[in-house]
Amino acid sequence: MSKAITIAEAQRYDAHATNVIGIPAMVLMERAALATFNNLLNDDFDLDRVVVVAATGNNGGDGIAVARLLKIRGIDVTIYLLGDPENATPQTSQQLKIANYYNIPVTADLNQIVNATLIVDAIFGVGLTRDVTGKFADAINAINAADAKTVAIDVPSGINADTGAVMGVAVVADSTTTMAYNKIGLLTTVGKQHAGTIHVADIGIYAQDRVEHAR
């Protein structure tokens, strides 16, 4: 999949997969998590102490699912949670319940980020439209200050997926697992600098013309 897409296209293809084709959003989330997890294992990362920095949107849900896959494999993993769990998307709320079943620690201690050997960035996906501030900016600054390598899910948090612009502050990742298609903003100079090595993951979301051609 060499095509690069806009935010609007990413959202439209996602909605078509769930609302028209009927693929449950949880299935897509699990596929995104598994793709990210496999890239973590295949690349040269130190998995001694992994911290997944997740917010309560669906990008965060992807990360929380990654945390569970790591825990099942016997890897020391902690979730640094940003935002109120009561306001989580339905899928992310479910992922938090599953993480709780597996006794995955959830923290709000920034020192956990500082002491990690690998950080998974699952704060913001393609839908970010305003500058990052407050505790979200604090978390991104902590990620960038840490010695650990960082893997971003879909796009580095704080990067505009259309323009590649830094929205106040942005994660500088060593690797990014982006879903379905690359994003136009990650092809810009700044986008490339923040994304690191890009892995495009086929999770079952396609452009409508490809879907219709397959029917």
UniProtKB/Swiss-Prot annotation:
Organism: Levilactobacillus brevis (strain ATCC 367 / BCRC 12310 / CIP 105137 / JCM 1170 / LMG 11437 / NCIMB 947 / NCTC 947)
The EC number(s) this enzyme carries: 5.1.99.6
Gene: nnrE
Protein's UniProt name: NAD(P)H-hydrate epimerase
Molecular-function GO term, any one: NAD(P)HX epimerase activity
Residue numbers binding (6S)-NADPHX: 58-62, 125-131, 154
TM regions (residue ranges): none
Keyword entries, A-Z: Isomerase, Metal-binding, NAD, NADP, Nucleotide-binding, Potassium
Family (UniProt): Belongs to the NnrE/AIBP family.
PROSITE patterns: YJEF_N
Pfam families: YjeF_N
InterPro entries to which the protein is assigned, alphabetical: YjeF_N_dom (IPR004443), YjeF_N_dom_sf (IPR036652), YJEFN_prot_NAXE-like (IPR032976)
Broadest EC class assigned to this enzyme: isomerase
Binding residue positions for K(+): 59, 121, 157
YjeF N-terminal domain boundaries: 10-211
Function: Catalyzes the epimerization of the S- and R-forms of NAD(P)HX, a damaged form of NAD(P)H that is a result of enzymatic or heat-dependent hydration. This is a prerequisite for the S-specific NAD(P)H-hydrate dehydratase to allow the repair of both epimers of NAD(P)HX.
Obligatory cofactor(s): K(+)
Source taxonomy: Bacteria, Bacillati, Bacillota, Bacilli, Lactobacillales
Catalytic activity entry: (6R)-NADHX = (6S)-NADHX; (6R)-NADPHX = (6S)-NADPHX
Cofactor note: Binds 1 potassium ion per subunit.
